[in-house]
Amino acid sequence: MTRLEARLAELASAGQTITYGALARDLGWRMADLTAALEMLMERDAAEGHPLRAAVCAGRLGAGLPARGFFDKAAALGFDLSDPEGFVARTRAALSGR
């Protein structure tokens, strides 16, 4: 498990979210590196039939929802985003085991 995966798992199990900036600082990464790693993780999660762990990230704007790029990538991976807030809520619940 990578440091990114471990941090996302810790947040998910606690039912918490984190901003992209805070996560990048926690890991000591540049934002571009974090974004690329999250997109690769989303691809792997989708391929393995797992909830998207990147859903625990929250943009600075948007009421605690992930940034636009999360939704663009999820749509490209074939997820139904007709109810974005519901999709994120269901995904976060699945990740936290609740």
What are these model-predicted stretches?
Residues R3, A9-A12, T17-R98:
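Nucleic acid-binding interface residues in structured DNA/RNA-binding domains
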